[in-house]
Design a protein with these regions (language model features):
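A short, acidic, amphipathic alpha-helical segment used as a generic capping/interface helix at domain edges
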Residues: 184, 188-200, 233-242, 306-324, ...
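Structural motif
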Residues: 89-91, 207-212, 252, 370-371
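Membrane-embedded hairpin module used as a gating/binding unit in multi-pass transport
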Residues: 134-220
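An acidic, phosphate/nucleotide-engaging active-site surface
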Residues: 30-102
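Mobile "lid/hinge" segments at catalytic clefts and subdomain interfaces of large enzymes
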Residues: 90-96, 103-151, 155-162
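C-terminal catalytic subdomain
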Residues: 224, 228-331
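Extended hydrophobic packing segments that form well-structured cores
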Residues: 318-387
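Alpha/propeptide regions of enzymes that mature by internal proteolysis
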Residues: 2-21, 38-65, 182, 247-250
Length: 387
C-alpha cells in the first residue's frame, strides 16, 4: 500500500523531503534500518530521504507533545509529527487482537504514537480486569479509551487522520483494503474482519485449552522462554478463545520456559519479574510502575539500544494476569526451569500427558480439549455454539 500512497502524494505535488515515515512502535523496541527495509520494501524506502524514516520515540523531549486528557480522563501525550503535519496517514491492518478485538483504527495512533503514561491508562488492571475486556471485543472500555485518545489528538491536528487499513487472512494476504477517516474505516472493515476472525465451533464449551508456545514469536526472540511473555501469550489465548470454554477452564501450555529473558531486547524484564515475586497478584504491580518505567538506564536502552520500554513489561504482566482471573489452573508442561513458571502462578509438569491427567483429576471427568498448536498465528477468536 505504501508505494501506491507515495505515488498519489507525488502526483499531488508533495516532494519526497516533505514526507516523513514514522514507525508507530509505541513501547516496542525500535526497528533497525534493515528491518525497516524488510517491512516497507526497498523501493518505497528509496523514495524517502533516509533522515525522514524514523521510529517513534516515546521519550524524545523534542518530539513529544502533551495534549492534556481525553474525554475519558486519560493522559494524551503524542508524537509532535502528528500535530504539525498537514496530513497524517495511518497505514495498518484490521486483524484479530486480544487488546480491543482488532488492530488498526484508533488503536494504531493511541498505542503506537503515544507515551508510556498514555498507554498505561488502558494497558492496566483498571481496564483489562473489567468485565468487558474478555472475550476479545470492540465493545469495551479499552476500545472506548483508544477512541477517546485518538479523538483528542485530532482536535489538535490540522485535519483528522486519513486511515488505510487492510483485512488480512491467516497467511497475511489482503482480503480487503479500506481508506478514509478512522471511524469510517473501522465501520467498513470490522464486518469483514469479524467474518475472517470469528470461528464458530459446533461443540459444547470445552474444559481445557491446550497450546504450544514456541521460543521465538511475535514480540521477538525468547518470547516463549521469557516467563512474563510466556504467560502473556497464555492470557492472550484465553481472551481470544474464552467463548469456546466453560467459565473457568484449565490451560495447558507446552513451553521450554528456561528463563532466558533475552536481556538485549527486553532489558527491564528480569527486574520486573523479581518485582512480581513480591506481589500477591499481578495487579499489585501498579505500585512499581513509576520506579521502573522512569528508570534512566532502561529508558536509555529503549532510546538507543533497541530495547523494549520498561513499562512494556508491566502491560505484559497484566495480560498474563488474565489467565489467573479467568481460569481455574494454568499448567506449563516441559519447562526446563520450572521455578520461573511457578513464579508466574502456573503449575508445572514434565509432560502434556501428565498435565492432562491432573486436569482430569481436578475436573472429575475426562476433559473436552481444544488444541491450538500454533498459538495465535491464525488469530482466530473461538466460540462454541452448543450450550
Amino acid at each position: 500500500m505504501l508505494p501506491l500512497i507515495l505515488d498519489q502524494l507525488q502526483e499531488a505535488g508533495v516532494r519526497p523531503d516533505n514526507v516523513r515515515l514514522t514507525c508507530a512502535i509505541g513501547l516496542h523496541r525500535k526497528n533497525r534500518r534493515d528491518e525497516i527495509v524488510d517491512y516497507l520494501g526497498a523501493e518505497a524506502v528509496s523514495r524517502v530521504p533516509a533522515g525522514n524514516i524514523v521510529n517513534h520515540d516515546a521519550e524524545d523531549p523534542e518530539w513529544m507533545v502533551d495534549l492534556g486528557r481525553s474525554t475519558l480522563g486519560d493522559i494524551v501525550q503524542v508524537n509532535r509529527a502528528v500535530i504539525e503535519s498537514d496530513l497524517t496517514i495511518s497505514i495498518g491492518h484490521t486483524a484479530g487482537n486480544p487488546y480491543g478485538g482488532f488492530s488498526g483504527g484508533y488503536k494504531m495512533p493511541a498505542t503506537g504514537l503515544t507515551s508510556w503514561r498514555s498507554i498505561a491508562s488502558h494497558h492496566s488492571p483498571g481496564t483489562m480486569y473489567g468485565n468487558d475486556f474478555v472475550p476479545a471485543t470492540t465493545s469495551s472500555r479499552f476500545r472506548d479509551q483508544l477512541t477517546a485518545i485518538g479523538a483528542k489528538m485530532e482536535t489538535a491536528m490540522p485535519r483528522p487522520f486519513f486511515s488505510v487499513d487492510a483485512v488480512l487472512d491467516s497467511r497475511s494476504r489482503q482480503l480487503g483494503v479500506y481508506a478514509g477517516s478512522i471511524p469510517e474505516v473501522e465501520q467498513a472493515s470490522w464486518p469483514l474482519a469479524t467474518a475472517r476472525t470469528d470461528l464458530r465451533l459446533d461443540i459444547e464449551p470445552a474444559d481445557v485449552l491446550l497450546i504450544g508456545i514456541p521460543r521465538n514469536f511475535h514480540y521477538g526472540a525468547g518470547m516463549g522462554s521469557n516467563p512474563i511473555l510466556m504467560m502473556q501469550a497464555i492470557g492472550s489465548s484465553v481472551v481470544r478463545a474464552k467463548n469456546a470454554f466453560v467459565d473457568k477452564p484449565i490451560v495447558i501450555a507446552a513451553s521450554v520456559c528456561d528463563g532466558w529473558f533475552n536481556r538485549s531486547e527486553f532489558p527491564p524484564y528480569e527486574e520486573a519479574y523479581a518485582m512480581l515475586q513480591t506481589c500477591q497478584r499481578p495487579a499489585d504491580m501498579r505500585g512499581h510502575e513509576e520506579r521502573l518505567a522512569t528508570d534512566p538506564e532502561w529508558i536509555y536502552q529503549y532510546r538507543h539500544n533497541f530495547g523494549y520500554y520498561p513499562f512494556h513489561a508491566f502491560s505484559m504482566i497484566y495480560m498474563g494476569g488474565i489467565a489467573r482471573e479467568h481460569t481455574s489452573a494454568v499448567y506449563i508442561a516441559g519447562a526446563k526451569e520450572p521455578s520461573f513458571a511457578r513464579g508466574m502462578g502456573a503449575r508445572t509438569t514434565a509432560t502434556v500427558e501428565e498435565a492432562l491427567h491432573e486436569a482430569t483429576d481436578i475436573l472429575g471427568h475426562k476433559p473436552k480439549v481444544i488444541a491450538v498448536p500454533e498459538l495465535s498465528k491464525p488469530a482466530f477468536h473461538l466460540t462454541a455454539t452448543r450450550s
